[in-house]
């Protein structure tokens, strides 16, 4: 039998493509070497959000006295881990049931290419023919093959790196007194904020002068201040040269400038992730790659005509003239930011977010089997950092907007205030958690090119504003909209130039 589509990888993008294609009456096979759901379900979005929720519950309980509650509480981490993992197992089973319901053939094992139409699966069990028992190898043939293998943690060549764990293994921790995280991206920041609120002494090590360097500086300043107030230790200019194991659950972190930090139960490395493509044998087919990422065009097609890729394992190459300089932020190519003219050379970009992979997978299936033409739109994708307090952001930072459009063409509206929720807290005003928000406007019409917020419920607030920015909302549009009171979000609709 020849499949219409073979999907390698059962994460968000692969599942979305497989199920959508099957609903278009395509004959589909999906290959997965581990648990269904990929990074998001198993070691990413879902368990992370549950831990974020636990940390948020901690904050409410700890401060409930300000609302008149006399609350004494204790925390049972092993119990939370057990309930979290049971929920994830339930999701794994739901994913399996959904594939069966949509008549997608599931194969368990590691896939590699034999040719552009054939793959070899090792260590498999065909779940649709269980009477056959376990199979050592299986060869599948498909007219189209989609690679959706996701990514995996990166471990740099640091002495003693074998003594560390990745963000994936963080979810296995059931007890710890002191944890150090090496890295300053969104995964590191989200985890360190959770760790502290679970009663664990916390250190985060950043190579540069601040965390989350690609985000708006004003927003990150607010976050860093809150983290320091909550006794999270931020170590900057931290060039780690060794992780030394002194004894069991006693690790020390050594920096190049001689600084030493000691007595860590766990050290977690969060310095990036790379595509999980090493077992695919792409070199047999001369599939184009860039820094190990599979290169695809805007239709998700690789350099081999019938092979596609979606999600965290690929990068989109845009080689035609780029007229919308606002897109440049997405390309992670800072050298382009100071260019005012159109850019014509090849640019590669990748947005590693679950909804992006799902969207790309579904639209690919629509193009392949319904002959539709819609492509994933990478412009103005909203992003949330589940820190404490959370951050919501859309579009350009103030710094990027000035570099692209010039300072004279950029107008900033911002406000910083205490959310009403914290108004009754019986503490000094400067200790109350602040909400900070900003609009980045460009041109005489004040087109909103960036929207940023940090504060309580920012993660829920930002979604609706993403629609407005996609529809080219201006500051005038915001001004003419009647706000909901009392809310934090209403501040976006009432901002004035003098507000600071």
From Swiss-Prot:
Names of required cofactors: FAD
Cellular localisation: Cytoplasm
Keyword Lyase belongs to the record: no
Gene for this chain: GR
Residues involved in glutathione binding: 12, 19, 95, 362
One GO molecular-function entry: glutathione-disulfide reductase (NADPH) activity
Name assigned to this protein: Glutathione reductase
GO biological process, one term: cell redox homeostasis
């Amino acid at each position: 039998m020849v499949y219409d589509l073979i999907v390698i990888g059962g994460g968000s993008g692969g599942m979305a493509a497989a199920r959508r294609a099957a609903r278009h009456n395509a004959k589909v096979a999906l290959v997965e070497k581990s648990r269904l759901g990929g990074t998001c379900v198993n070691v990413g979005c879902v368990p992370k959000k549950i831990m974020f929720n636990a940390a948020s519950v901690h904050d409410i309980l700890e401060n409930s006295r300000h609302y008149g509650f006399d609350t004494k509480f204790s925390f049972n981490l092993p119990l939370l881990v057990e309930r979290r993992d049971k929920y994830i197992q339930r999701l794994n089973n739901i994913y399996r049931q959904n594939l069966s319901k949509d008549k997608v053939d599931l194969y368990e094992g590691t896939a590699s290419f034999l040719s552009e139409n054939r793959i070899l699966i090792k260590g498999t069990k065909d779940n649709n023919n269980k009477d056959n028992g376990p199979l050592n190898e299986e060869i599948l043939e498909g007219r189209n093959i989609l690679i959706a293998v996701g990514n995996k943690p990166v471990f740099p060549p640091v002495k003693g790196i074998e003594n560390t764990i990745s963000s994936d293994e963080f979810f296995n921790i059931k007890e710890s007194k002191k944890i150090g995280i090496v890295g300053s991206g969104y995964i590191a920041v989200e985890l360190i904020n959770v760790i502290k609120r679970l009663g664990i002494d916390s250190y985060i090590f950043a190579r540069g002068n601040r965390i989350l360097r690609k985000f708006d500086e004003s927003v990150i300043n607010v976050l860093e201040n809150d983290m320091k107030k909550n006794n999270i230790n931020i170590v900057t200019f931290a060039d780690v040269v060794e992780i030394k194991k002194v004894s069991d659950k006693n690790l020390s972190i050594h920096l190049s400038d001689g600084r030493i930090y000691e007595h860590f139960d766990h050290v977690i490395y969060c310095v990036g992730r790379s595509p999980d493509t090493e077992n695919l044998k792409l070199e047999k087919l001369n599939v184009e790659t860039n820094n190990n990422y599979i290169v695809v065009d805007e239709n998700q097609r690789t350099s081999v005509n019938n092979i596609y890729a979606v999600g965290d394992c690929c990068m989109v190459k845009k080689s035609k003239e780029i007229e919308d300089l606002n897109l440049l932020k997405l390309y992670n190519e800072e050298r382009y930011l100071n260019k005012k003219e159109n850019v014509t050379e090849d640019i590669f970009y990748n947005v590693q977010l679950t909804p992006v992979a799902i969207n790309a997978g579904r639209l690919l299936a629509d193009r392949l089997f319904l002959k539709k033409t819609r492509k994933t739109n990478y412009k103005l994708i909203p992003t949330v950092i589940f820190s404490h307090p959370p951050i919501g952001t859309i579009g350009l930072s103030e710094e990027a907007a000035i570099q692209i459009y010039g300072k004279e063409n950029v107008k900033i509206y911002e406000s910083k205030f205490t959310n009403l929720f914290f108004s009754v807290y019986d503490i000094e005003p400067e200790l109350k958690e602040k909400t900070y928000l900003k609009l980045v406007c460009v041109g005489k019409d004040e087109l909103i090119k960036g929207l940023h917020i940090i504060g309580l419920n920012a993660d829920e607030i930002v979604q609706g504003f993403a629609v407005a920015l996609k529809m080219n909302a201006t500051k005038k549009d915001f001004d003419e909209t009647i706000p909901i009171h009392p809310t934090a979000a209403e501040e976006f609709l009432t901002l004035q130039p003098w507000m600071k």
